[in-house]
Amino acid sequence: MKRGIACFLKTRFRGNRLQTMLVLGVWLLSILACSQGYVSDYDLTATALFPAGGSGGGAAEPEATALPSLQPAGGGLDNPVAVGTPGEARFTPSQPIFTPLPTRSTPLPPILYYTQAGDTLPAVAVRFGVLPEEITCPEAVPQTGLINAGKLLIIPNRLEQTGPAELLLPDSEIVFSPSALDFDLKGTIQQAGGYLSTYREYLADGWKSSDEVIYKVAVENSINPRLLLALVEYQAHWVYGQPRNLAEVDYPLGMINFEKKGLYKQLSWAVQQLSIGYYGWRNGILTEVQFSDGSRVRLAPGLNAGSVALQYLFSRLYPQILWNGVLGGEEGFIKLYEKMYGNPWMRAQAVEPLLPVNLTQPELILPFLPGRVWSFTGGPHSAWGPDGARAALDFAPASVETGCEISDDWATAVAAGLVVRTDTGVVVLDLDGDGYEQTGWAILYLHVASKNRVSVGTWVQQGDLIGHPSCEGGTSTGTHIHIARKYNGEWVLADGPLPFVLDGWRAVAGKNPYEGSLVKDGQVINACTCGSFETRISRLNGGN
């Protein structure tokens, strides 16, 4: 941790001491708690942990020992590459698994943690290595829902050594949020005049300029284009300069794998790592990063999802000895990011929290016509790509044929909205109708056939026709519709604090992606790609 950061944190703790003592006093009088536990005088010596951000800001846990920082010299690190193999193991996010750390023989004072936007009690418990019932608080908080930012939680201090605790980027700089709507990607590239300004790449739908490639990855994965452009510059110097070697030409993000050659595949790999970090932290299922040599680092519990996304990505690209410097060194990524775009925390103030605590899902119906029988073929799984946010569900129409055929059945609008984007297999419905899928609720449909597909600019009512199920777009072995939700650019987990509910059927995640069920009034439909009798679901009698 940088010397200036530590000083800032000490100042912040002193400035909040009075506030902390007042809050604890109110708590002792009110005896309101998440867990009705006894509070001793010992608890009043707790360690405060305040989320903070911005240049020179961060969150710290003084008892945790930060890893030694080795800052790169000379404008970056030479040959910062990760070598991948075609059969590398994938991270498969699941539900939070509570594995509390052992109680210390001599307990340390508890931590006073102030919640951040997007926090839930189960996720916070996993990050701190405790059970949810061990966390106490001076006022009631939701047991599974989103918690207001700034709420005090008193948590047993069991973590010993963790990684760097400095907040790197706000969440809105990771996802394709409203803060990126005014970003001129093409203009920025052309004004910089580097290698990217003349770069072109051939994709499945023809030749694309560099800004088209970056935007395609950004909008498909809902990852901020500012971030992707900065990563290309930091790793390969493509924005303002030229690649320095052949590896930077073919593998600009540093993942050397012959199957991931070229800008599009490199970016696609990178956004998957960002999504694993971001949504794994959000969902309370990621607590550490692992480096290529097998060493592991426990993530500091006070981090935000955006910072974890970066820590996870760079752990896949750099050895541990260089990782700290890449994250927060004077020649590190964040310094470059601020140089390119200014203070990201100032932009975040206008758009965060991305998921307000009072947010509710609008009424949604099943994505097919009344009277038709479909199958629930996929429980919560990745919204886009092989890994990431488990925000999507799959439904397949009845068919006498297996495999990939365009169905005569229709997928329908789960809610009223404006069609703002179509592509191969893709339809995106903007529910607030402002024309941007990065604001408010948006619904992604995947595997919609091009034939008879609804057009961009069409306003549809709930239940209107969207298109025919098929295998178009993405990877599919059978005809179906893949559907996922976003809010303010963030994928909304299907079985999270804002569960996916269609005609009253609530999604429940299984142990692995694609597993899970739909539940309603005591009825349970388990997902299965087999399309068996038990998976059948219809909209007869209002979705029963």
Give the location of each predicted region.
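Ser/Thr-rich, Proline-interspersed low-complexity disordered segments
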Residues: 32-114, 137-140, 157-178, 355-356, ...
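Non-catalytic cell-wall polysaccharide-engagement segments
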Residues: 36-43, 51, 256-377, 515-544
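Primarily a LysM-type cell-wall glycan-binding module
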Residues: 48-64, 96-131, 151-153, 157, ...
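Short alpha-helical segments in extracytoplasmic peptidoglycan/chitin-binding modules
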Residues: 115, 120-138, 150, 218, ...
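Catalytic glycan-binding domains that act on GlcNAc-containing polysaccharides
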Residues: 168-325
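Short glycine/threonine/proline-enriched tight-turn/helix- or strand-capping micro-motif at secondary-structure
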Residues: 356-359, 363, 374-414, 445
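Acidic, glycine-rich catalytic/binding loops that coordinate metals and/or anionic ligands
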Residues: 362-364, 405, 412, 455-461, ...
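Zn2+-dependent peptidoglycan hydrolase active-site motif and core
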Residues: 406-456, 478-480
